[in-house]
């Protein structure tokens, strides 16, 4: 069979399977999730064996140590994946719930009910745990899902797919509820992105290059975020100790993730006193500072920032720093260079905090808290399938509810329209 025929058959099978999973009770879906969790532990030796094939190929191809670490399935990885599934199973089933209800003057009751999206296609890179996260959330929301992982994790993903298939079969559901694309070439991705008749939503998760490729080639709606250019603005009168802690956590905790802080904006009234403090603490962590002329005048070790540093997602121990006149200049900078991901203000001024929240355009705005909290688990959504910086359908971390839509349900007593 050609790539086109294989992908078309998968898409058709997913559409048929979506009707089966869509009408499943919450109890059945939760049983599938807990069975997958149990099977992950039972099949650990098999998963390690298949993962070893990917690790060997990764080392031979010269993949970075950081990428190899993300690719590795360890005991802790399996425990984390299993625990995540158990937590999703414990969540309330969103499908069939009424979002709101109201009465019309003619006696009609009008409501909005949560329903599955249908078929989700997830295209992602590197981390095998995304296979389990995506499958678990889609199942909980009553969706069928087609998964296309990165070529570097092909053996690991196939093994995880077999575990999922066992759990589906055990509970009387078609294995086509969760399908993994068996080939790794880009042609398969292009074919997937052309299946608008059968696939309802595409979610790419990976580097900016992958996401732009998906957006450019998809005839299906795409939920995405290109990059996370997150800012911390230190306001006039801000608590310096708090601001240093927030900057350190945002930059150093995990510099390679999308909710890490990339640019620090400091009110000019605080710059002379605050910048040496933050430089001393973050400097010990190996952070390189790239500053505006005013910053460089205060921090002699800072490198002059170039224009390309302001919109940069460094994903490294590098921090761009700019001294601004006031909050308006900070918000103007964010509007020009931000990526609609996460923005933080450190302030003790209630009025300015509220204005910052209202006017700054981002999927999450933090007041006196780290950018690192823009995460489904941290915000109480449970697991997440990614963070969307698209405003249509979902904005911010995408949990189970974001993998559903709503339909109108109208109840009457024989009313007809005049």
UniProtKB/Swiss-Prot annotation:
CDD domains reported for this sequence: ALDH_F18-19_ProA-GPR (cd07079)
A Pfam family per the record: Aldedh
Highest taxon above the source species: Bacteria
GO molecular function, one term: glutamate-5-semialdehyde dehydrogenase activity
Matches recorded under Gene3D superfamilies: Aldehyde Dehydrogenase, Chain A, domain 1 (3.40.605.10), Aldehyde Dehydrogenase, Chain A, domain 2 (3.40.309.10)
First-level EC class: oxidoreductase
Subcellular location: Cytoplasm
Known role: Catalyzes the NADPH-dependent reduction of L-glutamate 5-phosphate into L-glutamate 5-semialdehyde and phosphate. The product spontaneously undergoes cyclization to form 1-pyrroline-5-carboxylate.
Family indicated by similarity: Belongs to the gamma-glutamyl phosphate reductase family.
Name of the featured protein: Gamma-glutamyl phosphate reductase
Source organism of the structure: Desulfatibacillum aliphaticivorans
Classification lineage: Bacteria, Pseudomonadati, Thermodesulfobacteriota, Desulfobacteria, Desulfobacterales
